[in-house]
Regions:
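Secretory targeting and sorting signals
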Residues: 1-23
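Cell wall/extracellular polymer interaction/catalysis modules
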Residues: 23-193, 204-233
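Short cysteine clusters
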Residues: 196
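Conserved "landmark" site that anchors the functional core of diverse proteins
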Residues: 200
Length: 233
């Protein structure tokens, strides 16, 4: 056999064995069933439903492709994650699903460059979690007569957690009483959360500066796989 022919056959066999170079995996948001229709997305992902830690990443849609703008270690509910449509209030679980972001808030002044609506937390600021109140799952300032303080969050009392935050639109537009209230993306406390998603303070400030209301940012919360996988939402 001619040397040149032998080399060609060997080369061809290598190509057949190895195959073509694998295509790069699509960015995570591109693998989601829905991203909310905007061009900014926050992805909060835990390994499993029983996990209390994971990652948060935030993404921009640029020229038809999702590009990661940042990422941070994240914490979830002390009892893990649960499908948002079946969650029950007071269970210390983080609701999975795709949600809008109604507004930002904080005990501290907004980071320079913040463009989302940002409500300052005052001594009179509360989040009503009383299922009997007309203000259920709403920011109230001051606390209305029909909302019991013992069933609600006095926002200024939660430092450093509420130094900076974004409201997650879970159970927000048409609240189902008893499903849950006051689910936020906020600054880390000492450990796992009561159902919110938390990140380090510097990263929370970065997210606030990054989010642009004109680009309709959303947040998706879920697991790496299974029935609560972020790619299902």
């Amino acid at each position: 056999m001619r040397p040149g022919l032998a080399l060609a056959l060997v080369s061809a066999s290598v190509v057949c064995v190895l195959g073509a170079a694998p295509r790069a995996e699509q960015p995570l948001p591109a693998r989601l069933a829905d991203t909310g229709g905007g061009t900014q997305l926050i992805v909060a992902r835990a390994p499993r439903t029983e996990s209390t830690s994971g990652t948060v990443s935030w993404w921009d849609l640029r020229d038809g492709r999702w590009v990661r703008a940042g990422s941070a270690p994240a914490r979830f509910g002390a009892n893990g994650l649960v499908e948002g449509t079946s969650r029950k209030q007071g269970t210390n679980t983080t609701p999975t699903g795709l949600y809008d972001i109604p507004f930002g808030f904080g005990i501290e002044a907004p980071p320079s460059g913040t463009t989302v609506e940002y409500r300052p937390v005052l001594e009179s600021s509360w989040w009503c979690e009383d299922t009997a109140s007309r203000a259920y799952n709403r920011w109230v300032d001051p606390l209305p007569a029909d909302c019991r303080g013992a069933e609600s969050e006095h926002l200024v009392s939660y430092r450093p957690q509420y130094s900076y935050g974004l409201v997650i639109g879970f159970n927000y537009e048409r609240p189902v009483r008893g499903r849950g209230a006051g689910i936020f993306l906020h600054v880390n406390g000492r450990g796992a959360t009561a159902g919110c998603v938390s990140v380090p303070s510097d990263d929370m400030r970065r997210i606030l500066r990054w989010a642009e209301p004109s680009r309709s940012p959303h947040i998706v919360i879920g697991t790496a796989d299974g029935v609560t996988a972020v790619t299902r939402y």
